[in-house]
């Protein structure tokens, strides 16, 4: 009888563990990336998120390219990349933290992953990327977009934090993860060294995996 009870308890514990092992996947084949992006951010219930999402749509984030001629240099590339980063940030987070601990910090992972490149949509009614037209008058096939010469070259991670905090509050960990998501490849490398955090590393690793492996990018254009 005792063995039967012990087996029952183990079965119940296994069932409970399965329920908390992993959150719902960030994306499934065929899902609309706009819906994934909106739904994930709204589920955080962060105050001001509805206004931020309205702003994100108005500013052109959903249609913006992710780079000039590197990974996902196409219309909608920035949205696609952001959803990819969330997908792999969740996988990394669950693998390293475990399902139960990950669920406690999931909101921060979602916010940092989906907003880390928010600044790439531009600012002051100016897009960060514009069409790259050659001297011949034809658009470049190798590098379809270029940095907008009319927009000052504020690092996009800095701009991401600025735009997000117009509408929502970010935690210190979230700000640091967004600011340093490029890791030692970007302008913050001296300040970051030795001050990495769990969230910053998860977002950095997910960003690298998405951009370099899944999306086929390289470092030929640096972080942007």
Q: Which residues are covered by each model-predicted region?
A:
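Short acidic DE-rich linear segments
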Residues: 2-4, 223-224
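Acidic/His-rich, divalent-metal-binding segments that scaffold phosphate/diphosphate chemistry
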Residues: 22-139
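Acidic, proline-/serine-/threonine-rich low-complexity intrinsically disordered repeat tracts
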Residues: 3-29
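Short linear motifs in intrinsically disordered/low-complexity regions
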Residues: 6, 32-36, 208
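Divalent metal-dependent catalytic cores for phosphoryl transfer on phosphate-bearing substrates
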Residues: 68-74, 80, 102-222
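A short, highly charged, low-complexity intrinsically disordered segment
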Residues: 13-17, 218-224
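Residue-identity detector for threonine
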Residues: 8-11, 20-21, 44, 50, ...
